Amino acid sequence: DKLESARTTPEADDLQAIAAAMVEQGCKNLVMEVSSHAIDQGRIKGAKYEVVAFSNLTQDHLDYHLSMENYFQAKANLFASEYAKAAVINIDDSYGKKLLKQVKIPVVTVSRKDSTADWYLAKAEIKNGLYQVEIKSKSGESLSENFALLGDYNLDNLLLAVAIVNSAGLSLDKIAPTISKLQSVPGRLESINVGQKFTALVDYAHTPDAVERVIATVKSVTSGKIIGVLGCGGDRDASKRSL
């Protein structure tokens, strides 16, 4: 069944009702996004996660949080024993490094750049429109697979996903075969084809960092001209528009 949600993270009672319905229908696992608004407003009170993960933090939602420090601390509140048993943190991000210093629950680190991380991207080469990736763990385990989702942010997400499900108990021999089957979600570099003679892509990127990453990804696989059309939603954080 598909249930529509008006928010990234539902209200506390709705969240528990959805989780209960999933259990009744035989679901064994729940993967969800927890927004900074939801943490700040107590929407995840009563929830306890096996693993929580931190990818990065860039300017967004300052109309609500007012400062990047407030925004960071709202996110950091999720990484506490009240809500989680363990954490996975991307230490390539400066706020990830900051979070690593203050969390009190067990932590697994991931990185595309730092080979001392618990999970490290040892290789990512583009061939025939696909990444050939090799991921290594500090314990000596490794996997090599094709990965179809281009862009550094997708490599970050892949590292996080591998670390999350491994921390939750899934072995690498079960994880590896699924990587080549992964597909992009709607609205993330989604191809639109109505018979035009050029490639048209739609992406949800709405922060300076996200827009920069998307353009860099498109440049890496494009030989011709790139035209970007950006929109700015009204009554939101106006300070990032000039960025």
Language model: regions and residue ranges:
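Conserved nucleotide-sensing/catalytic segment adjacent to the nucleotide-binding pocket
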Residues: 3-35
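Short glycine-enriched, charge-decorated loop/helix-capping segments at active-site entrances
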Residues: 2-9, 68-69, 149
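Conserved phosphate/oxyanion-binding catalytic-loop motifs
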Residues: 203
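Acidic, Mg2+-coordinating active-site environments of NTP-dependent enzymes
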Residues: 23-27, 31, 49-199, 223
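Conserved helix/coil segment N-terminal to the catalytic DExD/H
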Residues: 37-45
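Short beta-strand segments
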Residues: 33, 90, 229-231
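Short, glycine/acidic-enriched loop or turn micro-motifs at the edges of active sites
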Residues: 36, 59, 93, 206-207, ...
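Active-site beta-alpha connecting loops in nucleotide-dependent enzymes
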Residues: 185-187, 209-243
